[in-house]
């Protein structure tokens, strides 16, 4: 609920949410939402091309997509894709579509957030589908992954707090 309130998917029933001292309802909604790249706990992977899943509705910029893929450690998956960014995911619309694991799907959702290049990155339980080794790699590389963005990392695991600057 907190994330949905912050991103203006819900309006608060009481009180105000301020950004730089201004009630967020004062900002133009579409412009305000561009400030956030969110990976919700119940993210979706679409039966589209891999690059389209990362670009999420934008025209696929190959350089930006590849940067996001590298930052979330998806190069092994990418290297197995017969058509690279044009590889179809899932087999809903293509018999040759590639099925990916839960961990690969979670990293693809993270790549989508990185690709958006918003100033705020919000990750809700972003390591839930990852094995312990991949989870540890995300934690140790987190600052490199989000780079100069303000990041909000939501987790029920105390171990996720080790890499955080502020709790």
Residue ranges and their predicted role:
Residues 15-22, 32:
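Conserved ABC transporter NBD signature motif
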Residues 6-7:
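Helix-to-loop junction immediately C-terminal to a conserved catalytic motif
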Residues 144-155, 161:
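Conserved catalytic loops of ABC-family nucleotide-binding domains
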Residues 121-125:
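Catalytic Walker B motif of ABC-type/P-loop ATPase nucleotide-binding domains
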Residues 18, 75-108, 117:
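ABC-fold ATPase nucleotide-binding domain signature/coupling loops
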Residues 163-167:
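Conserved catalytic segment of ABC-fold P-loop ATPases
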Residues 132-134:
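Helix N-cap at the start of a conserved alpha-helix in ABC-type nucleotide-binding domains
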